[in-house]
């Protein structure tokens, strides 16, 4: 019975014989050095999705749910949306890894200078700023944080400092209108939705 070697097998055998011949002569074969593989920690990005109308949140929501479904730890914080049983103690858990936070106010916020709202928004902000510093989540969605700044519930400098000092592993996605220009300048990616083009 006759067997033939494939071209790959023949090349391997030839290479093996060459190495043996070099060793018998007291020489070492020139083998290209394999560089060690260096794994680099992924760096989180700051993304902004903004529009002058409703709609910038829906695409981000689907991205957050998809990330959580794939095992990422995701937090969505909606700063101006209230509802029944909301607040830090009433956060909703979805997909195993997604937490949804809203302030403990009975309705959506649209007016500045309400002390109860200020406390409720600050409670959500404190949780978010802790996540930004610690890096214990993979993705943090800050919905309507620009409006919270515009209404005076979160100082712009506080938001800027938290974003500048955030853990490098956290992806931050800011959605909604009225994003301060200083925050826009920090962004790695800005998506602006427009009508009538």
Where on the chain are the PLM-derived regions?
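Extreme N-terminal, non-catalytic leader segments
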Residues: 1-45
């Amino acid at each position: 019975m006759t067997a033939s070697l494939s071209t790959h097998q023949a090349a391997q055998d030839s290479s093996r014989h060459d190495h043996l011949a070099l060793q018998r002569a007291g020489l070492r074969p020139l083998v290209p050095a394999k560089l060690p593989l260096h794994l680099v920690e992924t760096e989180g990005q700051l993304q902004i999705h903004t529009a002058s109308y409703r709609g910038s949140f829906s695409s981000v929501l689907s991205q957050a749910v998809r990330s959580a479904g794939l095992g990422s730890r995701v937090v969505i914080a909606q700063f101006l949306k209230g509802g029944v049983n909301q607040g830090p103690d009433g956060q909703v858990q979805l997909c195993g890894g997604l937490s949804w936070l809203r302030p403990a106010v009975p309705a959506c916020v649209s007016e500045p200078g309400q002390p109860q709202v200020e406390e409720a928004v600050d409670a959500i902000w404190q949780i978010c700023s802790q996540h930004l510093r610690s890096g214990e989540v993979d993705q943090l969605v800050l919905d309507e944080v620009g409006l919270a700044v515009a209404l005076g519930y979160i100082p712009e400098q506080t938001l800027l400092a938290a974003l500048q000092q955030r853990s490098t592993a956290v992806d931050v996605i800011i959605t909604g209108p009225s994003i301060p220009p200083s925050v826009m300048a920090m962004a790695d990616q800005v998506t602006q939705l427009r009508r009538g083009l």
